Amino acid sequence: MAFNFNWSPLMADAGFYTRAQDLLTTALNKSPKPPIIVDDIVVTELNLGSIPPELEILEIGDLAEDRFRGIFKMSYSGDAFLTLKTRVQANPLNTYLITRPAYASPKPLAAASGLTIPLQITLSNFRLSGFVILVFSKQKGITVVFRNDPLESLKVSSTFDSIPSVRDYLQREIEGQLRILFMDELPAIIHRLSLRLWVPEYRGLDAEARESPAASASGPGEDPLLSPPKDPVDASGNLLSSADIASLSLDSGVEMHSLFSQKNLLRLAALTNSQRTLSLFTPSIREVVFRAWTGCADQGEGAASGVVSPGSPVLSRTHSHISSPLSSLQDASSVLSLQNRSTTPGSSFSGYGLSLGAGRHSKTRPTRKRKKRVVDLRKHNKPADAESVSADSTFTESTTPPTVFSSSVIQEEANDDPVTPPMSPETTMRIPNRQHRFSTSEDKGKLRASVAQQLTYTQPSHSTLHAQRANHCPMIPLSADGAKTSSQQQPISHGSYLAPREKSHEASSAYESNANRSITDAVPNSSILEQAWMMKMANEIARRIQEGKFAANNNYPGAWEQARARTPPPAYGQ
């Protein structure tokens, strides 16, 4: 179904074109303009022509005397035209610099000066085609919505038609702006026009809106000099007196200074400087990055000294390692001893200076005590046996004083991973104090001999075992000459003492336990102190028997044969 428009009422109303021009001018300046346009776009002439658009009704949703809703197919190729005036920038370099940030600009001087030229554009020969949703109501006006882009083509005539590049550029830009106008702004313009035509309430509001700007422009302006601030200052920040304020006037030819309060100026200055500090009152400004600066005094001290203050935290690379419980305790004790020793002013930097200048791949690390496992495989029945374990001392080649500790019995699990013994001697050696043990008095030697006789009398089976061991490996004498004799023996290879290691430990442990049991059975009525002393002597005799066995096959004379003959940790025995 089709019908004809009565286009004459729109042509007869002269006020319609005036209102349409104002609405089009507002709509064209509302959207962001291209940078080449440096002035407002003003609609100077508007004519809808004598040819109405063609409408084809596709659907009617609601039909009554005062309302209508339907979907149309519109096509227009009439003689309507529109004339616009504005000013454009003729220097393309100026336009380029406006659209680029300041840090990326080459900053030309005279070449970047602007050159504005007035421009008049006439739009004609419109070709429109699209689907329109039309809703009419006398109370709500006319609502027109385009479901697609209706603009097909138009003709643009301007002042720069003689320049092809400028003509093509204007053609593209204006077509883009008109497409936005038809889809977004034109429905709102038609709705406001319909409200002014059919709704009396909006007509009265429109009249009041036109009268209010004229009344405000004709009325007297507000004089800021009537109520000056309490502490007025001029543009340079100097305080103004009441006489200076009285001499100022709005109509005077002298340059008018803005009167600001001193407090406001201080706040503005603090606001400007807050973007370069770590102030908590820095305002949150969008798309702004604040640069944090340190104080000049802090920078001067850091540059002069060149050494980081120990009070400040130091970021250093941390290396993790896996250690046994014994080594962890030793490391903790060494750290505590280092902290205790660093109380003097001369050594206050010892714990901190180790991490100074440590880079990402630096090789300088704090000296750490080498892990040394001291394992005692002998079995003890009473806590009093632990006194006999502190026989050796540990000497560590380090910058710190040597730490002497008594090793305790530690049960370690066998490690399945093969461990290669070190090729070079370690810095930490266990040196048995044989000289101290061999320098005992003759009275103690006689007393030990009496204890041995008691053991022989109490346990004849053990004395037989003692005699058999003496035949194979002679005993070490208890005098100082025995130490000299043992030091003249020849060394043997490492493989010679690895084979009978387990058997010797089993035999010594069995003999020690039997000796302890025999002493306990022999003197049941003696005091606790005598029993403890006798058990200590029995342990000493058992240890001497074991040392004598090793000394029989030892070919390494000197003070290091016992260190070589000692049983290594379980990892070396696998």
UniProtKB/Swiss-Prot annotation:
Top-level taxonomy: Eukaryota, Fungi, Dikarya, Ascomycota, Pezizomycotina
Bias regions of kind Low complexity — which residues? 212-224, 302-314, 323-334, 346-359, 393-403
Q: Can you tell me which family this protein belongs to?
A: Belongs to the MDM34 family.
Tell whether Plastid is among the UniProt keywords.
Answer: no
Q: What is its membrane topology? A: Multi-pass membrane protein
* A GO biological process held by the record: phospholipid transport
- Give compartment(s): Mitochondrion outer membrane
Q: What gene does this protein come from?
A: MDM34
The reply on keyword Chaperone is no
Name used for this protein in its record = Mitochondrial distribution and morphology protein 34
Organism equals Coccidioides immitis (strain RS) (Valley fever fungus)
